[in-house]
């Protein structure tokens, strides 16, 4: 399956030898980094050293690689801090945001918003003033058809999608 997607790297240990109990610690860690980005402690600009990713995006990418390619347990904070150190993220600031509850509060807010908007999968697209939801493994043409229908339909007419 992965052979059809050259950007996907799947190692032999993914979901066999290493089975994290939860991905919540990774999300908590990423939320701390996102807060640092919002506060301009770290750059939010794309970086050519990371293939055009921001630091936040690069950390998320490397967490996925650590699990899927390298078979590491991304539920362990030590693994996450090692990855963050590799890209020179301010690990002390990340730890402080996790310790003081700010990252947890932001993560819980995201969970509440997910419930409010009835998010059932990833990715999820909420369209048409909240009346339409697309989620999961959808092809580009389905998403494009729905967006085009909304953009080009005459006023006061129901959408076909």
PLM features per residue range, with description:
Residues 47-52, 57-161:
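C-terminal cap of thioredoxin/glutaredoxin-like
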């Amino acid at each position: 399956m992965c052979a059809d997607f050259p950007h996907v790297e799947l190692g032999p240990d993914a979901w066999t030898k290493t089975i994290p109990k939860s991905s919540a610690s990774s999300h908590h860690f990423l939320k701390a980094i996102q807060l640092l980005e919002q506060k301009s402690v770290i750059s939010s600009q794309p970086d050519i050293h990371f293939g055009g990713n921001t630091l936040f995006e690069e950390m998320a990418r490397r967490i996925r690689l650590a699990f899927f390619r390298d078979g590491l347990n991304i539920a362990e904070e030590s693994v996450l801090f090692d990855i963050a150190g590799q890209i020179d993220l301010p690990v002390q600031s990340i730890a402080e945001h996790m310790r003081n509850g700010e990252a947890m509060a932001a993560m819980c807010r995201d969970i509440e918003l997910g419930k409010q908007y009835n998010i059932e999968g990833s990715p999820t697209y909420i369209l048409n003033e909240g009346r339409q939801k697309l989620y999961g493994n959808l092809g580009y043409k389905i998403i494009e058809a729905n967006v085009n229908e909304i953009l080009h339909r005459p006023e006061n007419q129901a959408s076909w999608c």
